[in-house]
């Protein structure tokens, strides 16, 4: 919980330091399901992190406009026209928080990008076009997946086997060490941020420490 609060605190400090006086500033969020608005009816507990961001700000001065959508990659978000809709709303002094990676890893051609080439190029596009509109881009890498599964030993007790699953035909059991699944997709945003002199928040590390 401490690390999760640090994530929001980092955003608050970063955004408040440059807010324009006497004018409502909008914080746009673009990304995937980890940030997206969720259905909260009937006691559903799942939340995208951007759903909670407005609580950090006085809506009389700063408004969060969350455009993150389940299943989107840096590629499909552009190709579906979602980025154009955000871009036309950006005014000078607004912020755009950019967070992709989980779905860029997927094999489907309408979503897949490669770190170091197409993934980086899409992130740079978001940054460049935000700045052209007078906005301030904030780049984040993807949060970690809750992946604690390791290859099952040949002999395991019944309790461990109750939590077993199969991945690529290999029996896996739940372990106590978080397994990285993001690889270069978590590193690419760091490189792009340095290259473009863009604000960067290491959400992957923050959520890794939280786990």
Please tell me what each predicted stretch does.
Residues 22, 81-211:
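Alpha-helical cap/lid subdomain in secreted, periplasmic
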Residues 3-4, 15-24:
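Bacterial Sec-dependent signal peptides at the C-terminal "C-region" and cleavage site
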Residues 6-11:
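Sec-dependent N-terminal signal peptides
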Residues 37-47, 68-77, 106, 110-113:
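Acidic/histidine-rich helix-loop elements
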Residues 12-15, 42, 146:
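Alpha-helical transmembrane segments and their juxtamembrane interfaces
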Residues 20-68, 84-96:
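Serine-esterase "nucleophile elbow" of acetyl-processing enzymes
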Residues 53, 73, 81:
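Solvent-exposed, flexible loop/coil residues
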């Amino acid at each position: 919980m401490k690390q999760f609060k640090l994530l929001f605190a980092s955003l608050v400090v970063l955004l408040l330091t440059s807010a324009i006086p006497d004018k409502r500033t909008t914080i746009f969020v673009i990304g995937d399901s980890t940030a997206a608005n969720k259905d909260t009816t009937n006691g559903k507990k799942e939340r995208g992190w951007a759903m909670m961001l407005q609580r950090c700000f006085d809506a009389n001065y700063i408004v969060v406009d969350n455009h993150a959508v389940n299943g989107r990659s840096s590629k499909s978000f552009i190709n579906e026209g979602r980025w154009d809709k955000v871009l036309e709303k950006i005014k000078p002094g607004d912020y755009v928080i950019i967070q992709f990676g989980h779905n860029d890893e997927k094999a489907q051609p309408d979503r897949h990008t490669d770190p170091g080439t197409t993934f980086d190029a899409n992130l740079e596009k978001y940054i460049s076009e935000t700045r052209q509109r007078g906005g301030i881009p904030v780049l984040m890498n993807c949060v970690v997946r809750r992946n604690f599964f390791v290859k099952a030993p040949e002999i395991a007790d019944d309790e461990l086997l109750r939590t077993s699953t199969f991945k690529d035909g290999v029996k896996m059991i739940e372990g106590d060490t978080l397994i990285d699944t993001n690889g270069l997709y978590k590193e690419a945003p760091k490189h792009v941020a340095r290259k473009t002199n863009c604000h960067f928040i290491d959400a992957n590390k923050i959520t890794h420490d939280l786990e």
